[in-house]
Amino acid sequence: MTVQEINKQIYRMELKWKIKPFEALTVNELYDLLQLRSEIFVVEQNCVYLDLDGKDKKALHLIGEYEGKIVAYSRLFDAGISFDNASIGRVVVDANYRDKKFGHDLMREAVAQIQSNFGKDKITIGAQLYLKKFYESHGFVQTSEMYLEDDIPHIEMIRE
């Protein structure tokens, strides 16, 4: 291991996690998480489809903050809302923080929160195809052919 790799581990940034139902989100939290989702899912991905799909009120919202700023976020659902199994969606990390491995932290925390809040181990996601290896590194396995969602290639993946 190089000195640089050791220093990265020593000075690893830690996120502060919050898990909240929709009703418990503050106005500022809601604004900030919707802004982050829009920056990534609409602007960065050039996707002119509505991000607000009516499911936010049914989700637990997992928020990762660094120095008071929301930099990681996902929605968590019990079984029967998005898929037959519990599910994770709208997985997003602020573009300015992607080199910090916050996406991996977010997925580990999301899986733990689903197990804690819903008592479920089987989790389904609708993953953007280009992130297949990322999700495989968290135990997810592809279970469908590629399909288009909002003109973006996706696959269904399950973690058991």
Locate the predicted segments by residue.
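Short amphipathic alpha-helix that is part of the acyltransferase structural core
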Residues: 2-51, 56-61, 66-69
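Conserved catalytic-core motifs of GNAT/GCN5-like acyltransferases
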Residues: 124-126, 136, 141-156
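Conserved beta-strand in the GNAT
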Residues: 63, 69-78, 85-87, 92
